[in-house]
Amino acid sequence: MQIRWFGHAAFILESGSLKILIDPWISNPLSPVSLQDVKNLKPTHILVTHDHFDHLGDAIDISKATGAPIVGTYELTLEVAEKGIPEAQTLPMNIGGTIKLGDGVEIYMTQALHTANRGAPSGFVIATPEGTVYHAGDTGLFKDMELIAELYDIDVALLPIGSVFTMGPREAAIAVQLLRPKKVVPMHYNTFPLIKQDPEDFKSRVEAISRVKVYLMKPGDTLRI
């Protein structure tokens, strides 16, 4: 399995024959790739944590071009259907639910402490034969992250650290304590001035309270598991 970061909260996870795109705001200022580059990757599924512009992003355009179904809350899938995505090309679910994508990959939807234009914000646990990844979406710190750790053995946690709209470095470091992943990657920072952060601050905070390995990825980098 490998995970590539496109900046902000946008990632693509590859496992077996599946290419799972997450929160594809590919036109974000940090992205090292073009929208056409991502379409050419031919993602098999598109996961969207909520419908804010910086997470729904280019999902509709990519889905129309590739046929990849959009996975999200029921309300989010209704929203994208209103914008031209066929209902058959959506996979609605809700917090606490699970869907199977094939190749031994399962998607679990978790809560997130945030807002959305329609429906509820969410996170995703992506369980593959090679490992398990938790994409927190946009969220504040919440105590039930401990339950996520009890339910799923997380290999990699992708956590926002930008503050203002999500956790900052201090809160995200505590989230690492609650989630107990083997590795953590900070995201959702330095895309625009309001969420400017020093990722080294997050790294030092995590290392002061845990043995979790912190990977400071640059947009375009790939992490292999």
From Swiss-Prot:
Pfam families membership: Lactamase_B_2
InterPro entries reported for this sequence: Metallo-B-lactamas, RibonucZ/Hydroxyglut_hydro, UPF0173, UPF0173_UPF0282_UlaG_hydrolase
GO molecular function: hydrolase activity
Presence of keyword Hydrolase: yes
Alphabetic keyword roster: Hydrolase
Family affiliation: Belongs to the UPF0173 family.
Record-linked HAMAP family: UPF0173
Name of this protein: UPF0173 metal-dependent hydrolase Pisl_0803
Organism whose genome encodes this protein: Pyrobaculum islandicum (strain DSM 4184 / JCM 9189 / GEO3)
